[in-house]
């Protein structure tokens, strides 16, 4: 395979030579001589097309781009477009005075063996740099960094158009920044030519105005950009949080709340800030680099090409040495850790060392590790010096080369002294901008790659079925468990419910009792559609529970737990929580009276507008239960689930709840499931289910179960027995 690749590369080289050598006269004879620039571009584009097809064939044979082969495509582009680009800039710089002989001379010069070789030598580092920049945006995992960046910017919606305005202001600001180098060159020419003072003063004022305008445009650009990115931050936070809320209940069992919260808040904020900050710098320095490049070509296309050819050598070689220095620094740290380990082992086992009289042996061992580290330290220091020296010398050589070549152009009258001064200032800023861009690309890739954390939640499909569509206007509230089995997602092998079958009838109170761990609270969770049965069916009015619309179902089914959670809001907001309408104050007060919450709420100075604190921590357990019961009653549910919801209530409020369940006018249309360990509540229930190991062990009324003398009676007697 390697031999075929080298043979194909040699054939491409030969084709390139033949294209430039024997085919030139034929191509030139077919083109209009009055448009010399057209000839150059036709040859360049033809060369690019032919060589590009050849490269595609080579990459196809090798099943993709690997190693140096990946640089073939940018190499072909650099070779093919270099001369047309040079001819175009010469045309622009000469204001249309490029002659036919100039274009022909460029092409025939490039077909000479020495020039042909020089063009390849010059294009190779440029292609390597091109490939390096391209690899920074290579696909990471299953996503492409560019696609992820576009998706992040997609959160801007219509406001994404503001970025075009930002780019325009940015370019104008960068152009304004060019005033100082430009006028510095002009002032240099005036000083050398003894120009009058008014011209000098006028141009100083013009330079100042352009600089101030550039600063104002930069300020406006930054302001619009930051406001736009702030909109993106808020939108991303909202969408991520909404995506989390869509997940099934099992998702929150597998993932700790702290981890989810960190992902929604801190990780999302860090990713958004990192992307917006890095993108801002990237756009700014890219705009500067492009503006500087235009002014450099305008000043001297020849010196600009010299600068571009040397850029790869200026940055790639120090980068390579930097990797060597970094690897040596890692080895030094590893060597230091080993020497530290030797000392730690000796000191922690000092009695053993002394009992074997091996103090000198441990000292020699430690010294050996230090010698190894010393050798690595020397290599690291040399690599660091080489990196710094190479960076300094390569930059200095480029500056000296530009000054030398520019001086030759000044001597020949091709450019003025002022133009050379301006070009040097442009070139210094341009190399700095390119250096910053090269350092920003990895940062940008890392920032965009971190957005995978966000997309992991945004793209996650909930395991629970989608919301159904049933929303009948008349519902009875008949609940049927038919051979229901269930295991929690985080413990799929542990069956909590097994073959559970029972019916809850409208207008009745059914008490569900049993020992801890028998599955009582799981029944309540299934009735709220927080989980779906792993076996059997759960029906509401003859229809599977998952077929009901999500919002409709939870207006008909309400639950109160033993330790209900309230939100850090007012009593009024907590009672009205989740309603799709705004209840009147009379409705809120009425349900608060029913639940026994009205009396203590009225005792607060701000009444129903009093904040209850985070998770209701300013209230007692009984007060939280009373507010939660009011929150359930205001929905006027057909199915009310009380999961030990009165355990913390005082005697008066418990009596109030009993009246609510058994004497309220609404009880005839309400199905109640009462999960409790309180005998006073269970005894009055119309029907009692005794749950044992996930299935119904006994059922009947209180008197029937007591006469039967089974597990229910044993539990009642155990609870009634005095404590020893």
Swiss-Prot record:
Molecular function terms from GO: ABC-type peptide antigen transporter activity; ADP binding; ATP binding; ATP hydrolysis activity; metal ion binding; MHC class I protein binding; MHC class Ib protein binding; peptide antigen binding
Subunit organization: Heterodimer of TAP1 and TAP2 (TAP1-TAP2). A component of the peptide loading complex (PLC), interacts via TAPBP with MHCI heterodimer; this interaction mediates peptide-MHCI assembly. Interacts with PSMB5 and PSMB8.
Region span, Part of the peptide-binding site: 351-396, 429-463
Protein name: Antigen peptide transporter 1
Site positions per UniProt: Inter-subunit salt bridge with TAPBP: 16
Topological type in the membrane: Multi-pass membrane protein
Function recorded in the entry: ABC transporter associated with antigen processing. In complex with TAP2 mediates unidirectional translocation of peptide antigens from cytosol to endoplasmic reticulum (ER) for loading onto MHC class I (MHCI) molecules. Uses the chemical energy of ATP to export peptides against the concentration gradient. During the transport cycle alternates between 'inward-facing' state with peptide binding site facing the cytosol to 'outward-facing' state with peptide binding site facing the ER lumen.
UniProt-annotated binding residues for ATP: 514-522, 617-623, 677
SMART domains reported for this sequence: AAA (SM00382)
GO cellular component: centriolar satellite; mitochondrion; phagocytic vesicle membrane; TAP complex
Transmembrane segments: 12-32, 37-59, 69-89, 110-130, 163-183, 204-224, 275-295, 305-325, 395-415, 420-440
Domain called ABC transmembrane type-1: residue spans: 163-446
Domain ABC transporter: 479-718
InterPro entries, alphabetized: AAA+_ATPase, ABC1_TM_dom, ABC1_TM_sf, ABC_Tap-like, ABC_transporter-like_ATP-bd, ABC_transporter-like_CS, P-loop_NTPase, Type_1_exporter
Co-factor(s): Mg(2+)
KW Nucleotide-binding (keyword) present: yes
Sequence ranges on the Lumenal membrane side: 33-36, 90-109, 184-203, 296-304, 416-419
GO biological process, one term: defense response
């Amino acid at each position: 395979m390697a031999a075929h690749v080298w043979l194909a590369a040699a054939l491409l080289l030969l084709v390139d030579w033949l294209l430039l050598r024997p085919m030139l006269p034929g191509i030139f004879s077919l083109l209009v001589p009055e448009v010399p620039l057209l000839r150059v571009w036709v040859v360049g584009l033809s060369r690019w097309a032919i060589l590009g097809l050849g490269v595609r064939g080579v990459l196809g044979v090798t099943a993709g781009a690997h190693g140096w082969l990946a640089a073939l495509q940018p190499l072909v582009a650099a070779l093919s477009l270099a001369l047309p680009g040079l001819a175009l800039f010469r045309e622009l710089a000469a204001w249309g005075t490029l002659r036919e002989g100039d274009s022909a001379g460029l092409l025939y010069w490039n077909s000479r063996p020495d020039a042909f070789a020089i063009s390849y030598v010059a294009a190779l580092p440029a292609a390597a740099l091109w490939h390096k920049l391209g690899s920074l945006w290579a696909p990471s995992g299953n996503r492409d960094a560019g696609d992820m960046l576009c998706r992040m910017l997609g959160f801007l919606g219509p406001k994404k158009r503001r970025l075009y305005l930002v780019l325009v202001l940015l370019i104008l600001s960068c152009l304004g920044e060019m005033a100082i180098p430009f006028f510095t060159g002009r002032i240099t020419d005036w000083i050398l030519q003894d120009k009058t003072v008014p011209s000098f003063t006028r141009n100083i004022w013009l330079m100042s105005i352009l600089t101030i305008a550039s600063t104002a445009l930069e300020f406006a650009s930054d302001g619009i950009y930051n406001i736009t990115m702030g909109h993106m931050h808020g939108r991303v936070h909202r969408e991520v949080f909404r995506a989390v809320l869509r997940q099934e209940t099992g998702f929150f069992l597998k993932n700790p709340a702290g981890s989810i919260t960190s992902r929604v808040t801190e990780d999302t904020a860090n990713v958004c800030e990192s992307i917006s900050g890095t993108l801002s710098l990237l756009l700014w320095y890219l705009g500067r680099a492009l503006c500087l490049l235009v002014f450099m070509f305008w000043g001297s296309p020849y010196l600009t090409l010299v600068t571009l050819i040397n850029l790869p050598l200026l940055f790639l070689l120090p980068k390579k040495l930097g990797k060597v220095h970094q690897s040596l620094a890692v080895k030094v740290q590893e060597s230091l850790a080993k020497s530290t380990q030797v000392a730690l082992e000796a000191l922690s086992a000092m009695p053993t060392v002394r009992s074997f009289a091996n103090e000198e042996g441990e000292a020699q061992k430690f010294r050996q590790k230090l010698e190894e580290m010393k050798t690595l330290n020397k290599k690291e220091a040399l690599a660091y010096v080489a990196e710094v020296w190479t960076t300094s010398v390569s930059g200095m050589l480029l500056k000296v080369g530009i000054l030398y070549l520019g001086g030759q152009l000044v001597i020949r009258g091709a450019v003025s002294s002022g133009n050379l001064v301006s070009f040097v200032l442009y070139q210094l800023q341009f190399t700095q901008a390119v250096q910053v861009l090269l350092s920003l690309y990895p940062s940008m890739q890392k920032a965009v790659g971190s957005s995978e954390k966000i997309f992991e939640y945004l793209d996650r499909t909930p395991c629970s079925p989608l919301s159904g569509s049933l929303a009948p206007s008349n519902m009875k509230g008949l609940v049927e468990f038919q051979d229901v089995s269930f295991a929690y997602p985080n413990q799929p092998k542990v069956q909590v419910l097994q073959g559970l079958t029972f019916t809850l009838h409208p207008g009745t109170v059914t008490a569900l009792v049993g020992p801890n761990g028998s599955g009582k609270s799981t029944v309540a969770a299934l009735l709220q559609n927080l989980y779906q049965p792993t076996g059997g069916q759960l029906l509401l009015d003859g229809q599977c529970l998952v077929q009901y619309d999500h919002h409709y179902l939870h207006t008909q089914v309400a639950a109160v737990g033993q330790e209900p959670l309230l939100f850090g809001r007012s009593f009024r907001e907590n009672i009205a929580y989740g309603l799709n309408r705004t209840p009147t104050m009379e409705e809120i007060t009425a349900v608060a009276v029913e639940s026994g919450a009205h009396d203590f709420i009225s005792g607060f100075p701000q009444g129903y507008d009093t904040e209850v604190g985070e998770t209701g921590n300013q209230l007692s357990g009984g007060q939280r239960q009373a507010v939660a019961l009011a929150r359930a009653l205001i929905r006027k549910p057909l199915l009310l689930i009380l999961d030990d919801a009165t355990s913390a209530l005082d005697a008066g409020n418990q009596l109030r709840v009993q009246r609510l369940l058994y004497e309220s006018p609404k009880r005839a249309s309400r199905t109640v499931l009462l999960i409790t360990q309180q005998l006073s509540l269970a005894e009055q229930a119309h029907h009692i289910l005794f749950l044992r190991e996930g299935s119904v062990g006994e059922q009947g009324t209180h008197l029937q179960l007591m006469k039967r003398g089974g597990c229910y009676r044993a539990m009642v007697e155990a609870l009634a027995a005095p404590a020893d």
